[in-house]
Amino acid sequence: MAVRFPKNLVQPEGSMRFGLDALLLACFAAREFGASPHFGLKNPCRDTPWLPPGPGFAAIDLGCGQGASTAGLLLRSENVRALGVDFSPALIDAARKNISLLNLSERAAFRVLDLSRAGASFPRPAFDLALSNPPYWERGEGRASRDSLNDTARRGEGALSLFIRAARTALVHHGLLYLIFPASRFTALAEALGSCRFGMRKALPVRPGAEDAAVRVLVEAEKDTVHDIRFLPDLVLQEADGSSTPQALSFCPFLDKSAGAGEREQ
């Protein structure tokens, strides 16, 4: 039986529904890491016991939620194994179920982890790349949610710095971090990355339509470097009639509801 990703993902009651951002992040990371000159990263700790055994690069999804970005990365990158971590046992349980439905369990593992304790969990850097879709707002900013899991995913005091520090702990020297963040907070993101000795390498603005301003930015940052940003051509998601643009479908095939780009035989 074919299981189509991202349709019918298991999502706990009261959690933030996964959305387009998670899919865009996965496709951006897969594309840019595959094209990176650091594709030959030397990582003697890559075979961490937290990852399923096997060949390939080691990825970590920080705040993985239901596993949408983890699954998307694995579907787009056949030579990557991934660990997803989240503070919520309910979300980790959902992520494991989703990965199992997609027959990706041999390449992915999930673990409950408080990112403030990442240093104790990763005594030595072990990952080549990291993904993060961190809370976009500080505590008190943005629209509050009545559901605690949903609200925690949206905002948190010092949350952005917490996620970036966790990435620094987990990544090897010159490892690559991929994030998605509101375009309106690009300066805050640059400052947070710089304070943790991550240098921005690429930035991809994302616009809903051709006449719209960017609402998101996808970023590649490198550990132990300084900012040297190359802005990529804007990604425009929708035509005037609301359909996905050819550019968007090429970038993220998971947006094509009529195609089987995310199908896996079960």
Language-model features: where?
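Mobile active-site "lid"/loop adjacent to the S-adenosyl-L-methionine
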Residues: 134-163
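Conserved beta-strand segments of alpha/beta enzyme cores
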Residues: 8, 81, 107-109, 199-202
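SAM/dcSAM-binding transferase cores
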Residues: 213-266
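Conserved Class I SAM-dependent methyltransferase catalytic core
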Residues: 157-214
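Class I SAM-dependent transferase core
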Residues: 1-31
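Short glycine/threonine-rich catalytic loop with a Thr-x-Gly-x-Asp
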Residues: 16-19, 65, 211-212
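Conserved SAM/SAH cofactor-binding pocket of Class I
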Residues: 21-34, 54-143
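Intrinsically disordered, low-complexity terminal tails and inter-domain linkers enriched
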Residues: 32-56, 261-266
